[in-house]
Amino acid sequence: MNTIDPAVLSKSQQQILHVDPAELSDFQRQIFQLERDNTSELIHFERGTTPILLNAPHTVNFLKEDGSFKMREGYTKAIVKYLAKKTGAFLMIKENSDGIDPNKLEMENYKHQLLEVINKYQIQLVLDIHGAASHHDFAIEIGSLDGVSARIQTIESLKTALKDQGIAPVAENSPFKGGGITKTVHGNTNIEVLQLEINRNYRNLTHPEKLFYICKSLENFLKSFPQLNSI
């Protein structure tokens, strides 16, 4: 899969997508360190300054309750931490394993805490960040429960931000419409929530420009979110 799809770029956009090597090297270093950093907490939460919550539930390997093995979704932790630093968003991460999948449909502690944060800090948007396997035919997929968990304007704004950085193809609601976290937030609040599945080919620091443009897309989207107001 190519890093950038030139077919979706105008000439001016192609000129933008030439990142300075020093900037790219610094980005690579930051992502590596953010992924490596760890706490002893089961669930790690950091307060932000804008009413957006970034969530990464699958950052560690764990044995599921049914005995099957779930591998961590590499660099989803670093992506969330990096974007929180850039945008002032809140963040919540499953830092260590207790054998329970936070994205299952049943209510459990992680989702309880997620809802508490949403209510306490008047969060307006949740991005549920996941990693998809490399065989999927998309760079990133947007899951919105078939368009009901977020406004069409929000989804279109995200798609535009991705297109502006040359990220393609972008899938929607197939095969991942949104899991337990997306359904829990949508079913228990009146806010917007999207599940994002980032292809493994775009989460590889061997070629950091792929992840750089993904993060730049999401950063630009978050900074332009219509309901964005300082807390």
Regions found by a protein language model. Give the residues of each.
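N-terminal catalytic or cofactor-binding beta/alpha core of small enzyme domains
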Residues: 1-231
